[in-house]
Amino acid sequence: MKLTTHHLRTGAALLLAGILLAGCDQSSSDAKHIKVGVINGAEQDVAEVAKKVAKEKYGLDVELVGFSGSLLPNDATNHGELDANVFQHRPFLEQDNQAHGYKLVAVGNTFVFPMAGYSKKIKTVAQIKEGATVAIPNDPTNLGRALLLLQKEKLITLKEGKGLLPTALDITDNPRHLQIMELEGAQLPRVLDDPKVDVAIISTTYIQQTGLSPVHDSVFIEDKNSPYVNILVAREDNKNAENVKEFLQSYQSPEVAKAAETIFNGGAVPGW
């Protein structure tokens, strides 16, 4: 999924929260029940497998609460309507905690939905020529992520101390004199057919529409040690609860890994 850096908490969002959570009690106090927020679609399909594993292995009843986007799950978890959620990576959580004063913590890794470099012109990093044009996302989180991936491949060097949000201005060494083109994430799959673009760095969210597989069709790709691995998130006050631990163990199971491999066409790399 694509997680943007800035989110608006509007009156409409609060109304939507009320609709989504209407009729729902506070998060469960039953050790054999857990309420987990997920994003509708493929990610919920993966969570459904974890739900089945939790019931079979631990007798844990998992109630999945679906959301249409990343605006509300942290708010609902922080205020106790959910026990946990599973949809985001650590940089997103850290930003949301800082922006809204949430007391949320990561309790374990789930999947890396990897960003990768794709091309219809080359097959390996060694084939990237002097002066090649590399298209990357232009939103701050994913732009920084793409630059860090280029650095991992030793194509550029970034200024130290920039953390997870470097910009093109922080490139200190560019031995192949790559031309960095910043575009909206949704446009990146289309530029694979642009004769002026040699490589495009694209998130799993947008590459899925092309039928390409991050694992099988990319020139280079993030690995499971990526700081952008997705996480199971709970509150400070319930992070050690037995139901949270059992759901994490269920999610980090071979059954879930196998299902995610199929559901995401190789675009979900186990991060545990």
UniProtKB/Swiss-Prot annotation:
Membrane topology: Lipid-anchor
Highest rank taxon of the organism: Bacteria
Pfam families on file: Lipoprotein_9
Residues annotated as signal peptide: 1-23
Entry keywords, A to Z: Cell inner membrane, Cell membrane, Lipoprotein, Membrane, Palmitate, Signal
Subcellular location: Cell inner membrane
Lipid tethering residues (N-palmitoyl cysteine): C24
Lipidation, S-diacylglycerol cysteine type: C24
Entry similarity comment: Belongs to the NlpA lipoprotein family.
The protein's name: Lipoprotein 28
Record organism: Escherichia coli (strain K12)
UniProt lineage: Bacteria, Pseudomonadati, Pseudomonadota, Gammaproteobacteria, Enterobacterales
Gene behind the chain: nlpA
